[in-house]
């Protein structure tokens, strides 16, 4: 039987790169907290954008897709799903909304985990929503020649309820240890959840929801304003490689959590860095959208396109970005390079 024991996080023998990552994240978290108090409206707008990106990306990782227009309608207007994929997306929307609105009262307990899974599966009409798997499952991979092979055998269905009970208790025990850094603990728990693979379907999406839940409960809420799931999707090859490395030997209690911890923390760090970019202005100035566009271009060491600026500042409309860039070109503070789609802007 797999044993869940996180006491190794309390022995002081942690890789230096992980310790440095947690320190860097903590510093960015403090800065974000100060900004959130001062710029409430900007954070509200960023949250609305990130929610759409999170729902789109987490489902896309699993091959569940629809058009951007339909994603926005489902998320922002509660539009009724038109097909099976959209039903899956609507379920994820509801589960994510529940976490955003009520994370303080949702915990890493079996009852809450099952309820979130049921919510996520509700629109798709699966009868197994909110229930652990009843049949064993395997995780397959396909090689370059098209041959399938078993990459990982998760916990058997018969042992899953007991394993989830032990996982819950191990987490609650480690959470109460003041000497264990919660940023290191959370990815360990998420890895174990993925290796148990407790549900017939939806384990990957549930792991991302639970990641956000535990991060929010510990005050690390960058994923509310810069999509955590989108960062995973953008670098999913690294994510799956870290998962592969950390799950090797898991059944025999011989795995190393460190590759997955590093990937998880790197993803969170990227969220905080992206959030920091969106406030790239001189401290003390009123942060208007115009000022943020100007600072983004003026502080960049490389030429930026309008699309790149819009990605850095998703709450600022393309029309506003274009107007500010035009004014900056006229005043001579920036110069335009190239033409058409190849147009870039750089400090003059």
Which residues does each PLM region occupy?
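FIC/Doc superfamily catalytic core
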Residues: 1-348
